[in-house]
């Protein structure tokens, strides 16, 4: 049997294949004969390949593509057969399977043969796993590339996204992936399987730029080393990573050195190669070179660095100055030293063995590296001083060597004359002039004289002195301070001459001059100098006295009238009291006024007890209080007192204020005549009745009296002004002044102008005609009998009356500014009256007042806005009202016990500190205090609401009793009331009403006034029309007969005369002598 012809053909091709390219075998065949096939997941499949020569398989190699078995089979037909079997197929087996002849050449990883593409769809792995090297894609710039994100399912829809998760549009082939031109960067493929999104591995495309050169840099941390250290050299290749790098260095032959690819930074396209040589020797000195070659192009680049290795460290100095340096005073000078050293040395500057610290204010040292082994150190003198002279040492040291450099610093100082003085020696005319000079170098001293004083301004008039002159002697020497002391002695000075001392050194010359006076002229100059000194002392003393006088506090009225300038009333201005009118109806004749004891005296004036004759028909004789200034008062204080008078005339009458009765403003000092209050100020009254109060209220134990700051038995230590009847202080001179027309006072019995008023009927409380109330306490609230003592209802009554009085002031737009218990007086019947007693109080020595500039302020009573912002309103008076309540219910205790008025006090007030509840206050009363002390003024209650609140705490009958007394007061012929009506009869100012309707109008006007108390505008009471002349005549005819009866019916200000126990017959006789019927003598019960 012969060989088949096909066998010979194949054998012939093998023999001639290398020589004959036209002899080619047919492609192998694959069974199944398909281009692609889909295989179910986890199934088995078999591929059989046959060909005319030995064949092999090329199949996908990915992670998980194992379980592939290849075997060869015999075939009778002479074909070569190879079988590929895959068991448990997975998505990793998806790919191209190629059968090829063994002799086929492989080009770029691909072979020529028969192929079939197998899909193994896996819903849990839609993308075929890829090898790590397939995820980094290198591509030449401008060439297309393939992103091999293949799917295991041919029907899958795939999207390509970039690093920003934005889609990239390109052609997609499930067998290859995305094909196109892409920018450098990372890419990811996405697909959806049954509503679930899957992502492929990230593929990084790196573009190789077409370049004709390789940017290469070589870097060395150091170029100088010493033996035993480690050399580190780095070679950096930019812009292209496909390079081959080669090192050349002295130790390369012995393979000494470690080469490492440090890192790859794709964004900057940089490759870093590091050469490390440990334990270097001197012979490692030389060139270190790196050469980079492009992997695909004929591009080459090399760089080198010279490395020097020393046996040990070294220091070489190069100072830029000499061992002796001279610097002028105040000059700025730099001393520079250049250094070559390795390792880097530590450098120190020392002066006189003391280390100089860097960055001093006047000597600055600095050191810096110029190059790798070159350094520079600088010592800088800033405005050189004399004490900078000395020895300067510059010290350098490193691990292997120490070097020093020393130089001397000399500060050159210009010549300076420290002193030039003359020494008088006896009366014969011998005088010595001494000149003390210094400088560096030491100066030379010369002496010159000028005998013609008028021409001494010309240098040619000066003559140089020498020792050749017979009556002149000169000498010089160094003193213990190394200063030049030169002196010249003149044996006789017969006339005035000028002497000049000249000190000169290398930096210049200075001169000083003095005049030598003949002994005969010296005594005259001494007298003139003494007179001049005395004149200067007198002028300075006058200036000091004027300053002290101007800084002395001036009297100013605390009450102020305000006028709103904004709709909400929050903005206001003070009304100038001097612009208010003064009605002459208030004028009272001086001869109708007799002055008595001083009730109170202050820095600016005093309040005197007095007796007024003829203020009203029902009260021909009335005890009054007279306010006046001291004789030393200044014009500004007189103007302030006149302002107070005008404000009081503007306010009008009210039961709970100290009412104006009259005034004396003409032909003499200003007198303000006001009501007299029997019990004095409220503080004094509370102190005196404290024990009585505690005995009536045993539930209030007598605790330690720290809150009062005193011993109860020692009332002399109180800081309040007590309105006692002490005969202290001087009376104001009532005699006629030299420069003014003065109306003398009407002389009474025995011609006395000043009457020492005894305790008589005017001291006795009057009685009121009022209904009996159901409760005994209410009966005594407005009682005239002082023996009833002090009760808690009395304290509430005082509180209520003050609120009503302040409500009245607020309705008149009047701000008190000093509301305190010391400025609240108590009249008969326990009627409270608000006043301003500042004139009669020595506020400069009163601990309740704190100095603020040229004035004194009651800080503990003031609202925060008044203390810190100088803002005074009715609402700031509300704060003071709360403080007053604390005084009342502590029975006159000291405010803020234990606290001084200092920065701590102010900070506590700002932070919300408030006083605790006083011992005798109820919770309701303390709640009123807290409301008054609200830090926000607009949240404080008005006086109208305060009176309503306090009224609710009093018995129901109290308001009726109070309103009756108040109404009776407004109906009475009290001088404060009658002078506000019209001037109906010049001879008699009495009760002149048309009818009772006007009285009702006044009542209703008062109610309206209360409702408008916080309106911010002045709301005067309605005027009362006078009665007709006929009706007036009828009333006047009966007035003398019914004065007592009418006084009792009014129940307000008059009561019949009743002799008191301490009253004498002489008092009655005195009134009879002046023509006053004692039966007609009445007294205002509110005084």
From Swiss-Prot:
ATP binds at residues 599-607, 627. It is an enzyme of class 2 (transferase). Residues 1039-1057 have a biased composition (Polar residues). It comes from Gallus gallus. Interacts with homodimeric PDGFA, PDGFB and PDGFC, and with heterodimers formed by PDGFA and PDGFB. Monomer in the absence of bound ligand. Interaction with dimeric PDGFA, PDGFB and/or PDGFC leads to receptor dimerization, where both PDGFRA homodimers and heterodimers with PDGFRB are observed. Its EC number is 2.7.10.1. One of its GO terms (cellular component) is Golgi apparatus. GO terms for biological process: cell migration; cell surface receptor protein tyrosine kinase signaling pathway; chemotaxis; embryonic cranial skeleton morphogenesis; embryonic skeletal system morphogenesis; positive regulation of cell population proliferation. Residues 1-23 form the signal peptide. Residues 26-104, 116-208, 213-312, 314-411, 414-517 form the Ig-like C2-type domain. This is Platelet-derived growth factor receptor alpha. The gene is PDGFRA. Glycans are attached at residues 44, 75, 88, 102, 353, 359, 458, 468. Disulfide bonds join 49-99, 149-189, 235-290, 435-501. Residues 1000-1011 have a biased composition (Basic and acidic residues). The modification Phosphotyrosine is found at residues 572, 574, 720, 731, 742, 754, 762, 768, 849, 988, 1017. It catalyses: L-tyrosyl-[protein] + ATP = O-phospho-L-tyrosyl-[protein] + ADP + H(+). The keyword Zinc does not apply. The chain crosses the membrane at residues 529-549. Present in an inactive conformation in the absence of bound ligand. Binding of PDGFA and/or PDGFB leads to dimerization and activation by autophosphorylation on tyrosine residues. InterPro entries: Ig-like_dom, Ig-like_dom_sf, Ig-like_fold, Ig_I-set, Ig_sub, Ig_sub2, Kinase-like_dom_sf, PDGFRA. PROSITE patterns: IG_LIKE, PROTEIN_KINASE_ATP, PROTEIN_KINASE_DOM, PROTEIN_KINASE_TYR, RECEPTOR_TYR_KIN_III. Ubiquitinated, leading to its internalization and degradation. Autophosphorylated on tyrosine residues upon ligand binding. Autophosphorylation occurs in trans, i.e. one subunit of the dimeric receptor phosphorylates tyrosine residues on the other subunit. Residues 550-1087 are cytoplasmic.
